[in-house]
């Protein structure tokens, strides 16, 4: 199972770990399929660490708060799996504000980050050379003092490839 994030810088194809983290996978795939991530900005980037996205492009509280929400309500619980680690470039993981606060935001690693193991739910990884090239372009962008990318970069749309959760 995979999705392609078509961004303003190029494509990011993500393999989703559906069997290992089913609730997280269902949330991400449902948001992808619904168009939730369309026009979502990459709003935070820390060079040599990660880039973050997944907040709604047009927040309208309370249904669509600024920080985003899950398909289960505002947040849902972690699915920490010891075999899924923040151990390489291209790992995709849920952003959160502490234990069991997953919503819609996620990040992609530029490098391994073992300090996140046990804290954030890993649910996928980038696949393919084009994805890694796009990730390199993202990492090369300038950021301000608050780690906001100076150039606007967005997810334009998402393609879901063979969604096993589709009903």
From Swiss-Prot:
Residue spans crossing the bilayer: none
Family matches, as Gene3D superfamilies: Cyclophilin-like
CDD domains named in the record: Cyclophilin_PPIL3_like (cd01928)
InterPro entries in the record: Cyclophilin-like_dom_sf (IPR029000), Cyclophilin-type_PPIase (IPR024936), Cyclophilin-type_PPIase_CS (IPR020892), Cyclophilin-type_PPIase_dom (IPR002130), Cyclophilin_A-like (IPR044666)
This protein's record includes keyword Membrane: no
PROSITE patterns in the cross-refs: CSA_PPIASE_1, CSA_PPIASE_2
Residues covered by the PPIase cyclophilin-type domain: 1-160
Domain of life: Eukaryota
GO biological process: one example: protein folding
Swiss-Prot/TrEMBL catalytic activity: [protein]-peptidylproline (omega=180) = [protein]-peptidylproline (omega=0)
EC number: 5.2.1.8
Gene Ontology CC annotations of this record: catalytic step 2 spliceosome
Disulfide bonds: none
Keywords assigned: Isomerase, Rotamase
General function of this protein: PPIases accelerate the folding of proteins. It catalyzes the cis-trans isomerization of proline imidic peptide bonds in oligopeptides.
Protein name in the entry: Peptidyl-prolyl cis-trans isomerase-like 3
Gene: cyp-10
């Amino acid at each position: 199972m995979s999705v392609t994030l078509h961004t303003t810088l190029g494509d990011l194809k993500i393999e989703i770990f559906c069997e290992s983290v089913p609730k997280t996978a269902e949330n991400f795939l449902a948001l992808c399929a619904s168009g939730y991530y369309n026009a979502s900005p990459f709003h935070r980037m820390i060079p040599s660490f990660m880039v973050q996205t997944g907040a709604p492009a047009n927040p309208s509280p309370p249904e669509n708060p600024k920080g985003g929400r899950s398909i289960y309500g505002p947040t849902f619980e972690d699915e920490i799996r010891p075999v899924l680690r923040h151990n390489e470039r291209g790992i995709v993981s849920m952003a959160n504000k502490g234990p069991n606060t997953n919503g819609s935001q996620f990040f992609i690693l530029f490098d391994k980050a073992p300090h996140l193991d046990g804290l954030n739910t890993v649910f996928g990884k980038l696949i393919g050379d084009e994805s890694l090239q796009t990730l390199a372009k993202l990492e090369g962008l300038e950021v301000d003092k608050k780690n906001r990318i100076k150039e606007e970069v967005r997810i334009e749309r998402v393609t879901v490839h063979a969604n096993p959760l589709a009903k």
